Amino acid sequence: VAKRLLWTLLFLMLASCGPSSSTTPTLDLLPRLAVTPALEAWVASSLTAYREDHGSLEFTVEVLSYEAALEAAESEAVELVVVGWEPPSDWFATPLDVEGIAVVVNPGNPVRNYTLYDLAAIFSGRLRLWDELGWGEGIVQPVIPLAGDEARRRFEDVVMAGESPTGNALLAPSSEAMAAAVAADPNAIGFMSMSYATEDVRGVRVDGVLLGESSLADGRYPLWLEVIATAPQEPTGALRDWLAWVQAQGEGE
């Protein structure tokens, strides 16, 4: 999963070069962009649209954990990282977007609204049976991202108020795994970046607010990540061009 975005984008980049690509720089010489798993889908969507405008990508992309991405930038293994958590204070950093964190349940689950208190009780293990929320007698099965994932950090910051996740929670190593786990278990509930949400799971309301562009824009929806591009030094060349394009898209909305 961690390499899927990289190889997909490399394929698209090389395919766009066509037969006359003899002057194209080798992959080892192209600048490198790193993105964390929580924002992989956001970056993939952005780069797909960027390629439609520009015809090719002149940089490579890889997926790294938050800590690994910062270390790679510090060591100059990558020129730019896209993260959903605060970068070092002395680094170049620029906001790109806001990505919602969707709370998702199995489509067969009829409970469609959860307060922040409900979510804290569920993911801490204090609320263990669905009948406490008015549905059936099943045992609630929380599913959470791995420690260090930005969506998990933000969820714990906003929802958990210092409580630790229950030891009975399943760990999802990727958003794909999160969606698969929730889709497979009628009693499961999890959370993930909105760009990953599929028809196999159902997003629910949080404090009566459904996640969407308007509820993110006006601040009514409480769970979100700020998408930040960062590096020890401001990037140049192709990566700077992409950043300028992303920000221009945001200004036009």
Kindly label every feature range from the protein language model.
Residues 17-74, 81-253:
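Exported/periplasmic ABC-transporter solute-binding proteins
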Residues 6-16:
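Bacterial N-terminal signal peptides
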Residues 1-4:
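Positively charged n-region of N-terminal signal peptides that target proteins for export
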